Amino acid sequence: MKRILIGVGVLLLLAAGAAAGIWAWKARNPADVRGSATQEFETTEEPGATTRPETEILEEPWPQYGFDLARTRYAPDFKLRPPFRRLWDVRGGKLIEYPPVVAYGHVYFATSDGRFFAVDAETGKKTWERELGRCTAASPAAGNGIVYQPVMHGFPCGKRRNQPSFLFAMDAHTGAVKWRFRAGVIETSPLLVDGRIYVGSWDTRVYALDAATGRKLWSFKTGDAVKGGAAFAKGTIFVGSYDGHVYALNSNTGKLRWRASAQSRFGGKGTFYATPAVAYGRVYIGNTDGKVYAFGAQSGKLLWSKTTGNYVYSSAAVWDRKVYAGSYDGHFYALDAATGDIRWKFEAHGPISGSPTVLDGIVYFSTLKQRTFALDARTGRRVWTFPDGKYSPVVADEKHLYLTGYTRVYALEPSSR
């Protein structure tokens, strides 16, 4: 009888352990939320639509990270399709983690050791160069004859850890410094909207600055470092924080409109490193918990979440009612913008950290194994590859595709031309 009781006890303990394990797994991996096209899904807010507000019409070919103010990473007017041939390439000498911007007939980019280049877009010849004295991990922004570039101290800058960080404003034609704004570590790619610059910092704040003078207009404190860039739509700034929340702020005053949360895991949350993209009345953003999220742009309500197999540092691109993002699990995903369902996924055989771009029905991305892929954005079929590129590879203008390699920027044009 004692043996029977002991056996029953062991079975009960095993069952309890299994139940606890299942509970722990579910707590660590909360179930995905499936969305609907009937809830806060505005089909008139298609990326690239001609109905977008006048403030969103761009004066330069590719003036900031993510292309437009909503950071959709989709450029509707550039008809460039592979295969490509190389026109020129420029060596930066060090890692180029973030892509350039294209404005005023130039390609502007920074290397990780703080060198900033202005290169003629047609010839690849260097027009000017400036040593910024700090390392960089962000794209510039360009407008009003000025190029804005953040720099940082701290990791991975080593011995420069105790030095301040700045946002530099430089004359786009000469490189002369017009002003600089001091803050905590700035890893966010700045957003230029209607004469204002929006940038986040490791000091937990989002800043709004006068783009002409650098004067601080307002700041908003989040719960942790702000490492991703901000997006703009309908008078609202959207930004993610390492505290596991997405914030919607009044672009004029900095007042909080709403705060949304990643799904909890054991009482904690993943962090938002990615820059949000705004389309269809929704805010799309990846998280280090391995999920891509969609929140209502007006309400902040969680509309859907979709789990990938690992971290999502990749900032999403949005086009054709699909959300495109890469994951550290080595897959590139096309998700239904309304529901979050997987429309297709592509095995890239390497972690994906950077962000995609959509041009003329082709989506481009790179893996950490330093290969760039071009896929049919509707089907996921591979159409072209390039043996360089590691993070966010592609920007463009009407004639050229500019591909960011590990230490080089390439200018490519379609082979058919």
Predicted features and spans:
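Short loop/turn segments that connect beta-strands within beta-propeller blades
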Residues: 120-124, 171-174, 210-214, 250-254, ...
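N-terminal Sec-pathway targeting helices
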Residues: 1-14
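Blade/loop signatures of beta-propeller domains
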Residues: 48-86
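Extracytoplasmic beta-rich repeat domains
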Residues: 88-101, 129-144, 149-166, 177-193, ...
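Ser/Thr/Pro/Gly-rich low-complexity linker/stalk segments immediately outside membranes or between
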Residues: 25-51
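Hydrophobic alpha-helical membrane-insertion segments, chiefly the h-region
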Residues: 14-24
